[in-house]
Amino acid sequence: MPVPLGWDDDIPEQPNCPYYQWGRKDPLCPSDGTTLNKDKTLYNSSGNSFTMKRTPGGVSTGTSIKNPTTYNYKTSSPYDWNITTYYDYWNATNGNKTEMNDNSVVKTVYDPNPVGFKMPSPDAFTGFTQNGSNETTASNFNVESTFNNGWNFFTQGWKKGPTDFWRANGYRWYNDSGSLYYVGSYGSYWSAGPSSGMYGHDLFFYSGIVYPQHEGARANGFSVRPVSE
């Protein structure tokens, strides 16, 4: 998919897509499209505005489904929104695998993506640096031009083919009640793979780094960029 899940084309220049906690299906409140880390105004089916609820501590899968607009944050270990550890929320055939891999992802009922799309495998982002490793040296970033609210990554090998723009949507931090951080400066995108009982594999970047093998706490709210099934 050429844009993050839930992207709003009314304000294409700025980050404005919703965030997801690892393994959850429901989107959480996006930023308002500015770089001020401000929540977007939400409206219910009656047209009345409301704010995203924030609840400390872990909850069950069922509780999270019944409360789709609630951010469940954690300030102590384990840093997971769920009171039970699962490894296959976004890949039905994952089992208990936690290592980086390029295994086939089988979509689950918890996958937030539309028909025809699914979560990417953990290795999906490794083409964004020269050797697939976490990089702080700009010459090893597989990008075109300079950082501008995100990176234009090459998509067909090292410095080859067309580019895709990946926005720096910021993230919701698990350790601060799900508050927005670094909108327009940092980008974090989940993969389908867990890296442990507390963390998930993700892509993390800003102007000075590209980490295709990053690990983020599952209770964080990151962006989602799906791939075709």
Tell where the protein language model's regions lie, with residue ranges.
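A short glycine-rich, aromatic-capped structural motif
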Residues: M1-Y87, D123
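C-terminal, surface-exposed recognition/capping segments
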Residues: V3-D9, P18-Q21, T70, T75-E229
